[in-house]
């Protein structure tokens, strides 16, 4: 009987603790401004303009439910700006759920932003796996396009760059991956660029509402957190071909006067080194696009894989080799390493002076692409 009483007391205490914990968590969330995306721009006087997309449960005179809004403050440092967000909203600004860091053009093209990257990397509350991206224009303007997009800007960008990019031939970097690229060996790396593109308004109920979409087809190159250049479509395609985890590369070939679209379904990339020669070997498995928008009147839908002549895959091979060669030429011209060659040499030779600091013009390249049906 005594043991039953003791068990009963333990259960009562456990229940009370759970209730108190739930109450605390509820109040804790209610009193916080949960930041899901941060945008950083540079003001004319070199102060930071920080825009936060905030999710906060409504209380008091605010609307009922959870909603997002943006708030912009100006400060001398990121830490000061976050403190100002707390003051303005009357709620503690929380970075624990923030998964997007967006750099505005006024910032990343003009200054060395190493201190900003270090601040977030060494923050206990900020996720190292967060998405980092650059804005075409000001980050503040992009983060305020929620109404035009009819959704949270931060969540839309995070979804594309974290989940969908690997299937649409778009190389990406997390905050940690980018930060490491700027600290180690060649000190070069890239960040995805996001641009808002206006489109025609198709909503008769709100004829004056701005509508549009985000374009992701550019990468910005940095060396030790200083702006170098923006990669165009062909250079992005070349980098995608040399990125193992990325598929969805698109090729358009011609047969019988028609244009036919192929998509990469599987890929194997091998980067070998012999002396100072880099051997780039890419194996692609490509399939026909399920639909084609190039005026073939649906003729592809009746074509089976067995009907495809090898000449089509030879065209893909030539296109892929040309794209990779353009990326190689670009890296040598600008002396940037976007495919981790310095790390390859370090793995082979150890931390030698050559492996740590060779110029891209000091090595030669051979390129081989093989294409098969998927």
Listing of model-derived features with the role each one plays in the protein:
Residues 2-374:
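Membrane-proximal alpha-helical signals and transmembrane carboxylates
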């Amino acid at each position: 009987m005594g043991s039953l009483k003791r068990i009963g007391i333990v259960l009562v205490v456990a229940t009370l603790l759970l209730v108190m914990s739930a109450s605390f968590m509820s109040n804790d969330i209610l009193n916080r401004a949960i930041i899901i995306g941060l945008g950083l721009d540079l003001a004319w006087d070199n102060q930071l303009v920080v825009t936060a997309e905030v999710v906060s449960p409504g209380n008091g005179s605010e609307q009922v439910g959870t909603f997002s809004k943006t708030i912009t403050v100006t400060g001398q440092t990121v830490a000061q700006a976050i403190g100002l967000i707390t003051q303005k909203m009357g709620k503690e600004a929380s970075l624990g759920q923030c998964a997007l860091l967006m750099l505005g053009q006024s910032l990343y093209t003009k200054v060395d932003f190493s201190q900003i990257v270090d601040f977030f990397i060494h923050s206990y509350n900020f996720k190292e796996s967060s998405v980092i991206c650059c804005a075409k224009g000001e980050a503040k303007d992009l983060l305020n396009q929620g109404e035009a997009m009819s959704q949270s800007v931060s969540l839309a960008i995070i979804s594309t760059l974290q989940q969908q990019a690997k299937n649409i031939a778009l190389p990406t970097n997390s905050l940690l991956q980018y930060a490491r690229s700027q600290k180690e060996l060649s000190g070069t790396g890239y960040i995805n660029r996001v641009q808002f593109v206006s489109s025609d308004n198709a909503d008769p109920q709100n004829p004056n509402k701005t509508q549009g979409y985000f374009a992701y087809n550019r990468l910005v190159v940095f060396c030790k957190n200083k702006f170098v250049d923006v990669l165009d479509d062909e250079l992005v395609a070349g980098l995608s071909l040399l990125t193992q985890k990325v598929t969805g590369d698109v090729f358009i070939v011609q047969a019988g006067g028609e244009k036919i679209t192929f998509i990469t379904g599987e890929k194997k990339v091998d980067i070998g080194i012999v002396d100072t020669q880099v051997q780039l070997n890419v194996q692609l498995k490509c399939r026909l696009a399920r639909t084609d928008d190039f005026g073939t009147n649906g003729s592809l839908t009746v074509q089976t894989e067995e009907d495809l002549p090898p000449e089509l895959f030879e065209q893909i091979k030539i296109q892929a080799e040309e794209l990779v060669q353009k990326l190689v030429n670009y890296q040598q011209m600008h002396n940037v390493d976007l495919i981790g060659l310095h790390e390859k040499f370090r793995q082979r030779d150890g931390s030698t002076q050559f492996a740590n600091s060779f110029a891209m013009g000091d090595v030669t390249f051979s390129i081989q692409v093989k294409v098969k049906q998927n």
